[in-house]
């Protein structure tokens, strides 16, 4: 049975296994110690929300929600900043369950909106998001890495 829960500090080791897989998939490789320290800080400060999916006592996926502040709307929103399901667990409704719980979390926090982005080639993700009512926004996003 699938279980969705908010991540806690005692989930850190299992999360690191998933984060390592996720970062490899994205071809982003910060040191795992840096990822661990950053994640531990997020969990301790509770400034973001990580929801985990576990199946048969094994963590198989997560969704990471971060706050977004809109002066135009004078409300807070949330961004699905990261969503990952282990490859051998895909196609079983786990991402759908994670998004469903992310929507519940957004409503519980009285968020004005829930935003996300997906790679252009990830058609399965596009279809999934649209099935929830997400609409494609043609806004142009730019990215600049400002780290040294």
Regions found by a protein language model. Name each.
Residues 2-3:
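Extreme N-terminal starter segment of soluble prokaryotic enzymes
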Residues 6-13, 17-75, 81, 100, ...:
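Acetyl-CoA-dependent GNAT
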Residues 68, 81, 86, 90, ...:
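Residue-level recognition of the GNAT/N-acetyltransferase active site
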Residues 85, 91-104, 127, 131:
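Conserved acetyl-CoA-binding loop-helix of GNAT-fold acetyltransferases
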Residues 96, 120-138, 144:
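Conserved active-site alpha-helix within GNAT-family acetyltransferase domains
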Residues 107-117:
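Conserved GNAT acetyl-CoA-binding A-motif
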Residues 118, 147-148:
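N-terminal beta-strand motif that seeds the catalytic metal site of vicinal oxygen chelate
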């Amino acid at each position: 049975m699938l279980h969705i829960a908010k991540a806690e500090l005692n989930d850190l080791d299992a999360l690191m296994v998933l984060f390592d897989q996720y970062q490899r998939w994205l071809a982003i490789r910060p040191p795992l110690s840096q990822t661990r320290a950053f994640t531990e800080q997020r969990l301790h400060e509770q400034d973001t929300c990580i929801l985990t999916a576990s199946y048969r006592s094994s963590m198989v996926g997560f969704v990471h929600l971060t706050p977004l502040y809109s002066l135009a709307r004078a409300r807070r929103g949330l961004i699905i900043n990261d969503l990952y399901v282990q490859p051998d667990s895909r196609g079983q409704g786990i991402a759908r369950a994670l998004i469903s719980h992310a929507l519940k979390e957004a409503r519980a926090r009285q968020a004005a909106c829930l935003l996300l982005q997906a790679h252009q080639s990830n058609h399965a993700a596009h279809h999934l998001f649209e099935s929830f009512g997400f609409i494609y926004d043609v806004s142009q996003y730019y990215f600049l890495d400002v780290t040294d």
